[in-house]
């Protein structure tokens, strides 16, 4: 217990000494300002943080909450606001504000939250305004003092000035910058996207991504020129290679339509739903068919969807044979019969 007390006592004494030292430093700063420091603001340190507008004696603000009357000093270089007395100067606590950067003029940049150094080319105007005895706030112009005749004269002077400025610009820049009206015939001719004679102008009609671009339209150029585009449409050149009319992804492509070529090997690449134009039974067996075959032969069962050698048959066979049970759906050797045969079995 004794060792614990001996440890706590020096720590408490150290805290008391530090707080006393800080209080003494604050008082020294206040006395330094009272002795004649040329700083209109009370600050513990110039590296303070500030958000908001700085309250300086250059602007009119009669807010008594910001006036620290117990810490007033006189700074003769800045003119005081008429709303306050000649002995009022403002003090400011550094903890109320947050500032990032260095302040260049102490009366303008402190209104803003700044990141960096201020650069103001019109600093001479502010210095001239500070050194003058005129009021730094703008007075509202009274409308009662203006007569009707003064208003008419002012409007006439402004109209003459505008006309003179237009004439000066016209003489200076010439006729190139004057407003020119577009004829109606030109507007109507440019509405439709007609193919121009120049090949360079033809490419300007489309949306381009570098040298290769997507084209949504038709062109009269050769077929090798069309292969660079993703095309949604029909080429004007009707050649025998009809596959190039459609959207292509490499050598194999999806075709939505019917070709005029009766080539069986070409049809093998497609998933076909419908009739085949070629009357070849071997070609029909390659597809999953939902329809009727064009070839009316005796084997009517091939009209249906087949799964291997066994198939589901939904219909009636045209061949009336003794084996009536084959007309129905069969599952293995035993089958389910939905109907009645023509021959009465015992």
UniProtKB/Swiss-Prot annotation:
Top-level taxon of origin: Eukaryota
Single GO BP term: neuropeptide signaling pathway
UniProt modified residues of type Phenylalanine amide: 51, 100, 115, 209, 216, 232, 249, 256, 273, 290, 307, 314, 331, 338
Localization terms from the record: Secreted
Compositional bias per record (Polar residues), positions renumbered to this chain: 160-172
InterPro entries: FMRFamid-related_peptide-like, FMRFamide-related_np
The entry's keywords: Amidation, Cleavage on pair of basic residues, Neuropeptide, Repeat, Secreted, Signal
Signal peptide: 1-19
Propeptide feature: residues: 20-45, 54-94, 103-109, 118-203, 219-226, 235-243, 259-267, 276-283, 293-301, 317-325, 341-346
Chain positions covered by the region annotation Disordered: 137-185
GO cellular component: extracellular region
Tissue spec. comment: Central nervous system.
Biased composition (Basic and acidic residues): 141-152, 173-185
Major site of localization recorded for this protein: secreted
Primary role: Can function as both cardioregulatory hormones and transmitters and may regulate cardiovascular function.
Family statement: Belongs to the FARP (FMRFamide related peptide) family.
Protein name per Swiss-Prot or TrEMBL: FMRFamide-related peptides type HF-1
Organism this protein belongs to: Cornu aspersum (Brown garden snail)
